[in-house]
Design a protein with these regions (language model features):
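Acidic, Ser/Thr/Gly/Pro-rich intrinsically disordered interaction regions
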Residues: 1-43, 47, 54-183
């Protein structure tokens, strides 16, 4: 990635679409369109964020270490192509475990998702999403609040490195960044 600005601008646009379409009015007007716009905003933002983080020197140390609160749910049945939706009876909804995970991990889960489903609020808007990668599908599903994901998107889109410290590592035969300061 040569320049991060266009990617961050696209991320901002995806975040704005997520906020714009996750309203009672949009769901009442055209539920399929609202859901599709939000789903695409979530998946596209995961790819953009992951790409930005993978390009050494483009994001600050704070962005690399940004943590998101998630809730883990254990499956009670084997998750397969025919049985992969987190409905009642497939997960232990009584024993959720809340923890903080790196945002980059959530991006990986989304990019490699086997399970993806949203939780709808009483007003018809999306409150959270459930995701499990192809690797974790029979171990855990993670629930991420939409508000947490939106905050993460905003943090990344406004992350600008103002100071960079690096040195050449003979063993790696490449430069290693030791400090990337956020401005």
């Amino acid at each position: 990635m040569y320049e991060s600005s266009p990617w961050k601008e696209d991320l901002k646009r995806r975040r704005q679409l997520l906020l714009q379409y996750n309203t009672k009015e949009h769901f009442e007007k055209d539920e399929d369109k609202a859901y599709t716009v939000i789903e695409k905003a979530i998946f596209y933002s995961a790819f953009i964020i992951r790409k930005l983080l993978d390009c050494n020197g483009k994001m600050s140390d704070e962005a690399d270490q940004y943590a998101i609160k998630v809730t883990e749910w254990k499956p009670t049945r084997k998750i397969t192509v025919m049985h992969r939706w987190p409905r009642e009876g497939k997960f232990d909804w009584e024993e959720g475990k809340t923890k903080n995970v790196l945002g980059n991990k959530v991006c990986n889960w989304l990019i490699h998702s086997f399970v993806f489903l949203t939780e709808v609020n009483e007003d018809g808007t999306i409150g959270s999403f459930f995701v499990s990668s192809d690797y974790d599908k029979n171990k855990v599903a993670y629930q991420v609040e939409i508000s947490e994901w939106e905050k993460y998107m905003k943090f990344i889109e406004t992350d600008w490195v103002v100071s960079l410290h690096s040195h050449y590592d003979e063993k790696k035969q490449d430069y290693v960044f030791t400090k990337k300061e956020r401005g």
